[in-house]
Amino acid sequence: MNLHQTVMKLNFLAILFMLLPFASVAQEDQSTLTKVGDDVPQFAFEIEKGKQVNISDYKGKLILINLFATWCPPCNTELPLVQKQIWEKYGSNGGFAFFVFGREEGWDKLIPYKEKKGFTFPILPDADRGIFKKFATQSIPRNIIVDENGKIIYQSIGYTEKEFAGMVALIDAHMQKKQVQGK
């Protein structure tokens, strides 16, 4: 192989590595079925055993939806932080609602999981992925924030400290704005 061929191969590899992140983003976009600015998909869910509600029942509140599974390591990193940094701050605020849905898991797994972890926020079943399928085709954890008008204002896939800090900052800013407006 001559010098020219070697340089051409190195240039090709450099371009390939530069384009690799875009392939990853495209895959994420394909797995996400909703977009920021969309109306939240309508769905009913069991808020407690035997009691059905609809997501539209919570219109007028800032809603955080978390899609997770008990076996998911990033989910198990994120949820204790949600407990401390979001739920303990806003859980008793009437203008805030938070729902964690266990993908492919029922009450039989979720109740003991919640008790073992010491979580005080609602962890609810999504045994058939019916709720998950409204938002995505794959990948957890996912967080979706819905504003008081039922519009999606934030979505994330996976867990990173930076992404989580940004989500907390958005919730803080939104809740402070509501407090100033007296809502």
Show the residue positions of the predicted features:
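Non-globular targeting/processing and membrane-anchoring segments
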Residues: 177-183
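Short active-site neighborhood of thiol/selenol oxidoreductases, capturing the structured segment around
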Residues: 54-76
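Thiol/disulfide oxidoreductase modules built on the thioredoxin-like
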Residues: 113-119, 126-172
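Loop/turn elements at helix/coil->beta-strand transitions in domains of secreted/extracellular proteins
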Residues: 60-62, 94-97, 121, 148
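Structural microenvironment flanking redox-active thiols in thiol-disulfide oxidoreductases
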Residues: 76-117, 130-133
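Bacterial Sec-dependent N-terminal signal peptides
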Residues: 1-29
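Short loop/turn microsegments at loop-to-beta-strand junctions
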Residues: 40-41, 63, 140-142
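N-terminal "domain-start" segment that seeds a small globular fold
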Residues: 27-55
